[in-house]
Amino acid sequence: MSTAYFDADCDLEPSLKSLFSLKTLKWIFVGGKGGVGKTTTSCSIASRLAEERESVLILSTDPAHNLSDAFVQKFSNAPTLVNGYKNLYAMELDASYQQAVEFKLKEENSLFSKFLPDLISALPGIDEALGFATLMQSVKSMSYSVIVFDTAPTGHTLRLLSFPSLLEKGLSKLFSIKQNMSGALQLINSVSGNAIEEETLNSKLEDLKAITTSVKETFQDPSKTTFVCVCIPEFLSVYETERLIQELAKQSISCSHIVVNQVMFPIDLPSGNDQGESVLKDSSELLKLEDIPSDHSKLVEFTEKIVCSYNKLLSYSKLLYSKYYSKRNMQMKYLEQIRDLYSYDFHVAYIPTLNNEVSKIRVLIS
């Protein structure tokens, strides 16, 4: 494939206009492999949304929180207004918050409370899934126009997305176990004298089921929820992106936007083997006439130094351009794959490699 496809500005426009035009969206998840710029992308999307929506919350579910670093401001479990904004809030979830929103089964002073935790723990992963579902129910009740989720790397995110399905299966087993234990519960009631009301158990399980259904329905509603995949044009990142997209499809979660970060755009240089020479072809203009010695012997020495410096700089320039084009050619292969895989069914935004490190978030995606 010709590199001309990627040289056209119109094909590499860093735009997610179609995402920002979806006014009904409530949850926007941003995810991908570690180190591809998820937090920068999340913050940029949230910043852009703050220009159009009444209120925006960006929420980090990644244990290695970076929102505070991105905005150069400390955030916590509580939504905090981001400096410089009137309607953009940020929060970073940690273990204490997740524990606080979980069902407090052990705090109930009833014999019933001694059984359900054991039933739940008998199903691998369901306790964590319950905590997540309750957390999402809490987030759902927040009165923000839209919430942007800055998620953990792909593996953690895939586990997170599988929780609703895991809960459905787990709760079905719990209902089955409850039915099988009905006789034992009646026996315990008669021996202990403490009434374990079956209605209480039913109510608790129905509450869990209702939360699971609510979260799953919101996840699978493309008018309310979407997922933005972030990657870079390298093998592992493109591979994980495809794995993530396939898993999202299995979970019936909308995903129609991909952000490709760190793209090395072409620079205006002559073609051929004289790229290094072209950089320095006018280097003689840098010399001031008054610096040139008039003495013949000194002039020879001066000229030798100039030639030596020129050759060193030329070699260094060739090395830099060699590294640039090697990296560029490697990216071209994966940019081609991204185009072939996603250009027809996805909105793909290509973000150029920045000259400087991102320390304060600005809108990178329009």
Swiss-Prot record:
Active site as annotated: D62
GO biological process terms held by the UniProt record: tail-anchored membrane protein insertion into ER membrane
Record's keyword annotation contains Cytoplasm: yes
GO function terms (MF aspect): ATP binding; ATP hydrolysis activity
GO CC annotation: GET complex
Keywords per UniProt: ATP-binding, Cytoplasm, Endoplasmic reticulum, Hydrolase, Nucleotide-binding, Transport
InterPro entries in UniProt: Anion-transp_ATPase-like_dom, ATPase_ArsA/GET3, ATPase_ArsA/GET3_euk, P-loop_NTPase
Coiled-coil zones: none
Cell compartments where the protein resides: Cytoplasm; Endoplasmic reticulum
Keyword NAD: no
EC number: 3.6.-.-
Binding of ATP, residues: K33, G34, G35, V36, G37, K38, T39, T40, E234, N261
Matches recorded under SUPFAM superfamilies: P-loop containing nucleoside triphosphate hydrolases
NCBIfam families: GET3_arsA_TRC40
Functional summary from the UniProt entry: ATPase required for the post-translational delivery of tail-anchored (TA) proteins to the endoplasmic reticulum. Recognizes and selectively binds the transmembrane domain of TA proteins in the cytosol. This complex then targets to the endoplasmic reticulum by membrane-bound receptors, where the tail-anchored protein is released for insertion. This process is regulated by ATP binding and hydrolysis. ATP binding drives the homodimer towards the closed dimer state, facilitating recognition of newly synthesized TA membrane proteins. ATP hydrolysis is required for insertion.
Family designation: Belongs to the arsA ATPase family.
HAMAP family the record matches: Asna1_Get3
Record text on subunit structure and interactions: Homodimer.
Record's protein name: ATPase ASNA1 homolog
